[in-house]
Amino acid sequence: MTFRGDTAVLVLAAGPGSRMRSDTPKVLHTIAGRSMLSHSLHAITKLAPQHLVVVLGHEHQRIAPLVAELADTLERTIDVALQDRPRGTGHAVFCGLSALPDDYGGIVVVTSGDTPLLDANTLAELIATHNATSAAVTVLTTTFSDPLGYGRILRTQDNEVMAIIEHADASPSQREIREVNAGVYAFDITALRSALIRLNSNNTQQELYLTDVISILRREGQKVNAQHIDDNALVAGVNNRVQLAELSAELNRRIVATHQVAGVTIIDPATTWIDIDVTIGNDTVIHPGTQLLGRTQIGECCVIGPDTTLTDVLVSQRATVVRTHGTSSTIGAGAMVGPFTYLRPGTVLGTKGKLGAFVETKNSTIGTGAKVPHLTYVGDADIGEHSNIGASSVFVNYDGTAKQRTTIGSHVRTGSDTKFVAPVTVGDGAYTGAGTVVRNDVPPGALAVSVSPQRNIENWVQRKRPGSAAAQAAEKASTRTGKQSQQKSEPD
C-alpha cells in the first residue's frame, strides 16, 4: 500500500508498562508468536511509509536491538528516537519528530506499540480519510461498553470533535461517554509542530498530553476530523496481564477462523492455538488441544493432534502427528509420529517414516520408510531408509566430553534393547540381537550379538532371601515340580 504524498509513522513505545508487573518491557510481551511491537511494525510496513520511527524510553537498551532485528526482517529502515524522561505522550511525539528530516512536510501518523491487533487496512483507511480532507488532524475513535482507562471523545452539538479528555481528568459525566480515543492519529506536520509547543502539564498526571493537541487545534480554528471504527478489538491496548490474555484469545480466534475459511478443519477452535506466522495446507485436520507455534508449516491433508505442540516444525503432506511435542524439526510426507513422541531440534523424519510411542529424537535423520516404533532415544544419529529400530533401544551419543554420531545403514533390523555406543556404524542390511551393546562397527549383512549365554544359579533366592515371599513361592513350586516328576516316574 502506498499513498500520494509523504507519510511518516511514529510508534510510541516509551512507557514503563508498570501495570504489567514484569521485568520484560511491555511492548516485548508476545501475542500469537510476535511481540506486540512486532505486530505494530509488521502492520505499518505494509503501508510502505517514507519514514518509520519508534520512540523508546524505559528499557530502551533492551528494545532497540530488537527493533534493529525487525528492520532486517522487514527489509526497511526503522529509526529510533529516545525519550529520556517520561513526560507524557505529547513529549514522546516531540522526540519522535526530531528523527524526521527538518524539511519533511508530509503527514504524520501516530500510533502505539501496545495495540497488537491494529492492522494495515485500518491504518490505510485513516490515512485515506485524512488525505481526502483539509483537516489538521484525523483521530481514530471507537466505542467500548467499559471504556475504563481510555480518553473520552468530547463532541459539539453539531457532532464535531471538540476535545479529548483523559480518563484521569474526566468528570463523572464525561466518564459516562463510551466513544473513546483509539490512540491513533493522522496529523498535518505543520499543525502538529505548532500545537506541540503550546502543550502544558496542568493535569492530574502532570504530563504533556498528545490529546491536548486536539483542543489546541480546535481553538485555532483548524479542522479536527474523526474516523470511528466498530471493531474495537483492533485498537484495544494492553496495560496488564488480563488484557494481554484477552487480546491473545481474540487474535487467536481470528487466526483460527482465517484457516477454517481457507479449507482447514479445526475440530475445537477453543482449544487450538495457532501463531500468526503458521501456514496450514488445505484439507488438514487439527484436533483439540493442539498448539502450532512459531513458523510451523503444515502441508495438505495432514492430521495433527490431539494434544500436540509444534514449534518451527515443517510437516509435509499427508503426515499424521498425534500427541507429540516437537521443535525445529521436519516430518516427511506420509510419515507417522506419536503418540507421546518428543522431537527435539534437528530431527528430520523421511517420507513414510515412523516415530512411535515414547520415542525421543534429537539432531538425527531418519530415512525414507524407516521406523522407530517405541520406547527409544535417538540422538545424533543417521538412520538409513527402511531400517527398523527395536523397542527400548538407546543411541548412546555422549562420551563424557562431546556428542558423537551413530550411522545406521539401510534395511537394518535391530533387536530390542540394543545400545549403540557412538561413534559407531552399522552397515546396510545388518541385524543386531536383543540386548546387544554395539561398541564396534557392524559390517553390512552381519549379525551383531554381544550378550553371553544365559546362566541360571539354582536355589539362589532360598539361600539369599530365606523366608521371603519369593523363597516360599519358589519352595512350593519346587515341591510341585518334584511331585509331578515322581508321578511320571511311577509305573502304571
From Swiss-Prot:
For this UniProt record, the keywords arranged alphabetically read as follows:
Acyltransferase, Cell shape, Cell wall biogenesis/degradation, Cytoplasm, Magnesium, Metal-binding, Multifunctional enzyme, Nucleotidyltransferase, Peptidoglycan synthesis, Repeat, Transferase
Region (Linker) location: 242-262
Which pathway is this protein engaged in?
Nucleotide-sugar biosynthesis; UDP-N-acetyl-alpha-D-glucosamine biosynthesis; N-acetyl-alpha-D-glucosamine 1-phosphate from alpha-D-glucosamine 6-phosphate (route II): step 2/2; Nucleotide-sugar biosynthesis; UDP-N-acetyl-alpha-D-glucosamine biosynthesis; UDP-N-acetyl-alpha-D-glucosamine from N-acetyl-alpha-D-glucosamine 1-phosphate: step 1/1; Bacterial outer membrane biogenesis; LPS lipid A biosynthesis
Molecular function as annotated in GO = glucosamine-1-phosphate N-acetyltransferase activity; magnesium ion binding; UDP-N-acetylglucosamine diphosphorylase activity
Which residues does the record give as Mg(2+) binding sites?
Answer: 114, 239
Which cell locations does it reside in? Cytoplasm
List the residue ranges of the region (N-acetyltransferase).
263-492
Give the CC-aspect GO terms: cytoplasm; membrane
Q: Which cofactor does it need?
A: Mg(2+)
Q: What class of enzyme is it?
A: transferase
Q: Give the span(s) annotated as Pyrophosphorylase.
A: 1-241
What the protein does comes down to:
Catalyzes the last two sequential reactions in the de novo biosynthetic pathway for UDP-N-acetylglucosamine (UDP-GlcNAc). The C-terminal domain catalyzes the transfer of acetyl group from acetyl coenzyme A to glucosamine-1-phosphate (GlcN-1-P) to produce N-acetylglucosamine-1-phosphate (GlcNAc-1-P), which is converted into UDP-GlcNAc by the transfer of uridine 5-monophosphate (from uridine 5-triphosphate), a reaction catalyzed by the N-terminal domain.
Q: What is the recorded name of this protein? A: Bifunctional protein GlmU
